[in-house]
């Protein structure tokens, strides 16, 4: 029985890294509250791209950036609205 590859040869798959690289997990739960609010919003919105959920996602990502759990980036690069000018 063949393995499905031409010639029956096994090839090593080379994984592709994520676009933004790896980032540390929030082991200390520093941003857990923001994450829970976002996930609850997504459940209520039936996983639709709701504006208020996007703002909660922004809060969560800001928390991750503030605690060095991800690299800082501009909101437009993350598909989120810019901060309001005050």
Curated annotation (Swiss-Prot):
GO cellular-component term (any): mitochondrial intermembrane space
Keyword annotations of the record: Cytoplasm, Disulfide bond, Mitochondrion
Residue span, CHCH domain: 28-71
Signal peptide, first to last residue: none
Compartments reported by the entry: Cytoplasm; Mitochondrion intermembrane space
One BP annotation, GO: mitochondrial cytochrome c oxidase assembly
Homology family: Belongs to the COX19 family.
Protein name (record): Cytochrome c oxidase assembly protein COX19
Biological source species: Candida glabrata (strain ATCC 2001 / BCRC 20586 / JCM 3761 / NBRC 0622 / NRRL Y-65 / CBS 138) (Yeast)
Encoding gene per record: COX19
């Amino acid at each position: 029985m063949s393995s499905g590859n031409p010639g029956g040869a096994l090839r090593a798959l080379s994984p592709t890294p994520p676009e933004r690289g790896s980032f540390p997990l929030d082991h200390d739960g520093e941003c857990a509250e923001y994450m829970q609010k976002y996930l609850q919003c997504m459940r209520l919105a039936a996983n639709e791209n709701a504006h208020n959920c996007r703002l909660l996602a922004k809060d969560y990502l800001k928390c991750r950036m503030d605690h060095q759990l991800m690299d800082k980036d501009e909101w437009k690069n993350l598909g989120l609205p810019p901060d309001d000018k005050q």
